[in-house]
Regions:
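Carbohydrate-active catalytic/glycan-binding domains of CAZyme proteins
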Residues: 1-465
Length: 465
């Protein structure tokens, strides 16, 4: 079943001596490591290299003298305090830690509240820990440096929002190119619309990195909105070959005409292959030229809301304003089934058709999720209206579902006791049509992000029998 905000938290991926490593935290279980020689192939079974709750955001580091280390932050919800970073020795193969767990930095004592997400590097004899602080939406990027991996560390803020529209520019990674350039990859949290990925130029002054561009004589950088692309050692003529160097953007649509779902889809829980079948015809029959996905009804968890349905097939929002249309056949709908679309965040809504006692019912749902620690409490309102079957044009019982997101304004809010201006407000509208032309506004609401993720939208079919 879904456990929103739990499970696997922020991982790191590293490459060392021919092996790829992914180190990830499960805040209630411990720190895990998995490895592979081929990132597109099979990964090893995860090994818990530090058991116990509390540590998060781990990052492994291999020194040039053969030693290895693990740096990590902590979660107050699991350990009782936050804003502290630790370093511990790690086995060179990454499969265990040993020795004393050393607290290298306490942000509570240095005006670096909520420092977390550490990444360790080495340059010119200095050990650097890149770590965001100040909160996801309001923070900045801090750098620690020391001649010893266990400290003591000095620190410096190297990236702030400044006059840019990029709030909370932090939590990312230093990337260097084959031509010797340095760049910083990070995100920006824009509430319901999720997190935007940014790439900032980076340079060094007195063995401190400066990220973005210096303005007004400041000793820190600000994010850029336009900048040249990184020099990856290719000529303009080489880069013009779109077969080798395609210009890409994340997929959003899917015709379901391949064996596997496209990568933009995310299930609401660990999925089972029996939940769906691609390449089917409108009646759900397998077809070589099929362009439908058949969603099999999955039992709804008793007494849990639609936001906890396991088989919600979702996508992240592709933009702060967009429209998504879904054509759906209800040919196979059985008594107790409910099929439709959903908009999922802390506030959520669903629209679809249910079958009850042989009748087709238009069902709309609006709800709110609240959390006390990790326990979810939901206030959900359900509205139903019987549908005249004459609205269906044929035996496929086809409906059209439209999901529209519009930015309606901005508001002021508080994050970590700080006032934040110009917070975007988006309205999500879910509509239904029986002819693909005339839509009725069935349900709308002000979108609100989920737990550390933006709003997702998608489709589902469940049953309660």
């Amino acid at each position: 079943n879904p456990i929103h905000g739990c499970g696997v938290w922020a991982p790191s991926i590293r490459y060392h001596e021919g092996t790829y490593y992914v180190c990830f935290p499960m805040p209630d279980e411990g720190i895990y490591m998995t490895t592979t020689k081929d990132p597109w192939g099979e990964w090893s079974d995860p090994v818990n290299i530090r058991q116990g709750a509390g540590w998060i955001d781990p990052c492994p580091f291999w020194d040039d003298d053969g030693n290895a280390y693990l740096v990590a932050g902590v979660a107050k919800s699991r350990i009782g305090y936050k804003s502290v970073l630790h370093v511990v020795r790690m086995q060179p193969d990454g499969m265990g830690i040993f020795g004393e767990e050393v607290k290298i930095f306490d942000g509570n004592e240095n005006d670096q509240i909520t420092i977390e997400g550490p990444k360790m590097y080495k340059r010119n004899g200095y050990y650097y820990v890149f770590a965001p602080a100040g909160g996801v939406k309001t923070g900045w990027q801090t750098i620690l440096r020391s001649k010893n991996p266990f400290g003591p560390y000095e620190y410096k803020v190297v990236l702030r929002q400044g006059d840019s529209p990029v709030n909370g520019p932090h939590q990312g990674a230093w990337v260097d190119t084959v031509t010797g350039e340095d760049w910083f990859l990070h995100f920006q949290d824009v509430y319901a619309a999720g997190r935007i990925t940014h790439l900032q130029p980076m340079h060094w002054e007195n063995d401190w990195p400066i990220i973005g561009v210096n303005k007004d004589g400041n000793d820190y950088g600000e994010p850029v909105m336009e900048y040249r692309k990184p020099d990856i050692g290719k000529t303009p003529e080489e880069l013009a070959d779109t077969q080798k160097y395609p210009v890409c953007e994340p997929d959003t649509t899917d015709e379901f005409d391949t064996e596997k779902l496209m990568l933009q889809w995310q299930w609401n829980a660990n999925y089972d292959d029996s939940w769906y079948e691609t390449k089917t015809d409108v009646y759900g029959n397998a077809s070589e030229n099929g362009s439908y996905i058949k969603l099999n009804a999955v039992p709804a968890t008793p007494l849990r809301p639609v936001g906890d349905y396991r088989n919600l097939l979702l996508q992240k929002w592709p933009a702060p304003e967009f429209t998504c249309e879904t054509k759906m056949s209800l040919y196979g709908l059985m008594d107790g089934d409910y099929a439709g679309i959903v908009s999922l965040g802390m506030d959520y809504a669903a629209l679809g058709v249910a079958k009850k006692d042989g009748k087709y019912v238009l069902r709309t749902i609006k709800g709110k999720q609240n959390f006390d620690c990790e326990a979810a409490y939901t206030d959900e309102n359900v509205d139903e209206k019987v549908i005249d079957t004459a609205v269906f044009s044929d035996d496929t019982k086809t409906i059209y579902l439209k999901y529209t997101v519009k930015r309606t304004g901005v508001k002021q809010t508080k994050e970590m006791a700080l006032s934040v201006d110009n917070v975007p407000v988006e309205e999500a509208v879910l509509e239904i049509s029986f002819d693909g032309k005339n839509y009725q506004d069935a349900v709308s609401y002000t979108a609100k992000a989920g737990r550390w993720v933006g709003v997702k939208n998608g489709m589902f079919v469940s049953h309660n029998n």
